[in-house]
Amino acid sequence: MRDLDLLCQINERTKAVVQMTLTTYDDKLCRILEPNVCTTSRRIQVLQKMQEERIPTIVWLTPILPFINDAEENLKGILEYCVVAGVKGIVNFGMGVTLREGNREYFYHALDQVFPGLSEKYWNKYGYDYVINSPNSKHLLHIFRETCRKAGIMYQTDQIFDYLKDFPEKSEYWQISLFDNK
């Protein structure tokens, strides 16, 4: 949040949008899946601060990894965080992950490092598939869409991308300078 003052200045003149991923409701699992980023709880604090400052936010709900973070409780927890934080939209390309050749082998190997034996389950169920959807994909997508619809959160990717491309001017134009004291 060290750039909050700059984001606020931008948002006064046009539209600043803060985007981030949320993959898991649980900080412990977050540290395993995303070891080099801040935890989910910290990201939620950022989203809430952005809401306080009236800076719109977009969450990327991806990747959803079968048998790891595809539990209904996880999805509902993330969505509740998003509702409370007042996010503008949630981008989701389906309840799964895509694995290109080369990435797949690396991913399956990495699975066994953290979740011993899980790669065998993936190989048996998905093999060389490019799209790896959760077995609960349809149910999870229904929960996702209904929660977003009821909360007034954008969830259709075309609508979100159109929103992201629209930059209305809110005040007179002026170029921000490194030397401004404002």
Language-model regions, residue ranges each:
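Conserved AdoMet/S-adenosylmethionine-binding subsite of the radical SAM
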Residues: M1-K125, D129-I132
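C-terminal accessory extensions appended to soluble enzyme cores
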Residues: Y108-K182
